[in-house]
UniProtKB/Swiss-Prot annotation:
Gene Ontology molecular function: cobalamin binding; ethanolamine ammonia-lyase activity
Free-text comment on the cofactor: Binds 1 AdoCbl between the large and small subunits, with 6 cofactors per holoenzyme.
Cofactors that this protein relies on: adenosylcob(III)alamin
EC number: 4.3.1.7
Top-tier EC class: lyase
Reaction(s) catalysed by this chain's protein: ethanolamine = acetaldehyde + NH4(+)
HAMAP family, alphabetized: EutB
Protein name: Ethanolamine ammonia-lyase large subunit
GO cellular component: cytosol; ethanolamine ammonia-lyase complex; ethanolamine degradation polyhedral organelle
Top-level taxon of the source organism: Bacteria
Species in which this protein is naturally found: Escherichia coli (strain K12)
Top-level taxonomy: Bacteria, Pseudomonadati, Pseudomonadota, Gammaproteobacteria, Enterobacterales
Length: 453
């Protein structure tokens, strides 16, 4: 394994695979904060060159956190299909990138090849891709999952309806649900981030969500994004269960900082299969985001792109209905400006799809970042072009509870009509029955929540 290269007469020597992975990243403030970023553009190019010549086996055999030290590493490594891996283990990362981007490589080819990839290998491919590569490659890798709606079908574009309220006021939540539905939003999930994380409050909010779903016979699923154990307890006590949610991290230490163990995720999957009101096989929902491991002091000297890829390796094990990166939510300490946020969003979507998960993105930023609403619109259009499964939707994109800026209900409508995309088929049929959509286009009734009253 070669760890050095010569560039413009200068020799660049790297100590190990972890350092090569980190320094091959595009510039981002989180890697600088962690002390792992390349010192110059020249060193970054040198690291990319070294990384491109490494083999799949080189990367697999050198995980950024040792197998014996970390349950996430063990899960990722143990899930590898050895037959698929043996076919590609001697490929260089450059050859793997070319394979993913090749027009001769089919969806089925990638579906088999991805079974032989560890998360570090997935991250390595992303690091030597341009933004256009990330878009083009992801578009070639659709991932379709089924709950009560079917998400990820090529030609469709879904959205989470996110009716958050600063007091968990159920009238406010219901009003936002009606407005979102009137724009054709909600086919991914109707999901509330609660202020208060307890069984009673969670049950009350779930009852509100399913009160609307049941009244209008809406083919979708609800979720309250409390801690996974709170959701499990509420569902066991009789609350209506849709998707079961949890934020995840790419290391065992990071999971512990979130109060999560793999056994909890195992239990969530079992409870969902037993109790939840889901027609399909997929009942879990995960959120991630670059920088989460570093913010928890749980990155072990690894860069944030690689740690994010490990989130997807963990998620893949549980076959979730949806996963999304909350890409700019963590703030400028980790992704400083719109350029870094856009790059991260494209990387995350590409890595999620190459990992084989139903990947969406919360196109967002915090109010102290060097970004504005144009960032969200730029990123959502780029991601929709890349085949992203879903984005978020809330009134005017302003989340007054979480205090950040995301995409609005009308943004989903704009993307669908701009790029000739449709909601999930089950949800579109319901929209047509309500007079909100006809022939894939919103009608004059759209955007008027009073049609539900």
């Amino acid at each position: 394994m070669k760890l050095k290269t010569t560039l413009f007469g200068n020799v660049y020597q790297f100590k190990d695979v972890k350092e090569v992975l980190a320094k091959a990243n595009e510039l981002r403030s989180g890697d600088v904060l962690a002390g792992v970023a390349a010192a110059s553009s020249q060193e970054r190019v040198a690291a990319k060159q070294v990384l491109s010549e490494m083999t799949v086996a080189d990367i697999r055999n050198n995980p950024v956190i040792a197998y014996e030290d970390d349950c996430v590493t063990r899960l990722i490594q143990d899930d590898v299909n050895e037959t698929a891996y043996n076919q590609i283990k001697n490929w260089s990362i450059s050859e793997l990138r070319e394979y993913v981007l090749s027009d001769e490589t089919s969806v089925d080819d990638i579906a088999f090849t991805r079974k032989g990839l560890t998360s570090e290998v997935v991250a390595a491919v992303a690091k030597i891709c341009s933004n256009a590569d990330l878009i083009y490659g992801a578009k070639k890798m659709p991932v379709i999952k089924k709950a009560n709606t079917t998400i990820g079908i090529p030609g469709t574009f879904s959205a989470r309806l996110q009716p958050n309220d600063t007091r968990d006021d159920v009238q406010s939540i219901a009003a936002q649900i009606y407005e979102g539905l009137s724009f054709g939003v909600g086919d991914a999930v109707i999901g509330v981030n609660p202020v208060t994380d307890d069984v009673e409050n969670l049950s009350r909010v779930l009852d509100t969500i399913y009160g609307v779903i049941d009244k209008f016979n809406i083919p979708t699923q609800g979720c309250v994004l409390a801690h996974v154990t709170t959701q499990i307890e509420a569902i066991r006590r009789g609350a209506p269960g849709g998707l079961i949610f949890q934020s995840i991290c790419g290391s065992e230490k990071g999971l512990k900082e979130f109060g999560v163990e793999l056994a909890m995720l195992d239990e969530a999957r079992a409870v969902g299969a037993e109790f939840n009101r889901i027609a399909g096989e997929n009942c879990l929902y995960f959120e991630t985001g670059q920088g989460s491991a570093l913010s928890a002091g749980a990155n072990f000297g690894a860069d944030q792109v690689t740690m994010e890829a490990r989130n997807y390796g963990l998620a893949r094990h549980y076959d979730p209905f949806i996963v999304n990166t909350v890409v700019g939510f963590i703030g400028p300490e980790y992704l400083y400006n719109d350029r870094q946020i856009i790059r991260a969003g494209l990387e995350d979507h590409f890595m999620g799809k190459l990992s084989g998960i139903s990947m969406g993105c919360d196109c967002c930023y915090t109010n102290h970042a060097d970004a504005d609403q144009n960032l969200n619109e730029n990123l959502m259009i780029l991601l929709a072009t890349a085949g992203c499964n879903y984005i978020m939707g809330m009134p005017l994109g302003d989340d007054i509870m979480l205090n950040y800026q995301t995409t609005a209900f009308h943004d989903t409508a704009t993307v669908r009509q701009l790029l000739n995309l449709r909601p999930s088929p089950e949800f579109e049929r319901w929209l047509e029955s309500m007079g909100i959509m006809a022939n894939g286009r919103l009608t004059k009734r759209a955007g008027d929540p009073s049609l539900f009253f």
